[in-house]
Amino acid sequence: ESPGVSGLGILKGKVKRFPSDMGLKIPHIGWNFADIKKPCPIYDGIADGSFVYFVHSYYLDAENRSDVATKTEYGISFDSSVAVPEINLYATQFHPEKSGRVGLKILENFAKLGGDTLVR
């Protein structure tokens, strides 16, 4: 989000602001779909195209397309989550904690990845 400032260096790509010349409301706030692009354990039991809740002005443009787990449309198509299981990395641009039953299922799946035995 800060030009000239390096991120953590875990993922290759660019963080970009939504274009201001497209008439989009920025920040992007509200419900939108997540189009699942690859099998991912945090999306087990989640229907492709499920709606999730966003509040953001920036998005990741991942360099490695195989990292992209979901894409979403908001004036442009953007990477809305990434998954790199080999390094236990799962990241969403949307807010699972604000995404109703779908979000709760995503959080449950994530907890199970860590071996949480209290999850039903």
Task: Name each region found by the language model.
Residues 1-29, 108:
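Cysteine-nucleophile active-site neighborhood
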Residues 13-16, 22, 75-84:
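Mobile beta-alpha loop/short-helix "lid" or hinge segments that flank ligand
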Residues 26, 31, 58, 62, ...:
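Phosphate-binding/catalytic loops
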Residues 31-83:
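Catalytic beta-strand/loop cores that center a nucleophilic Ser/Cys/Thr
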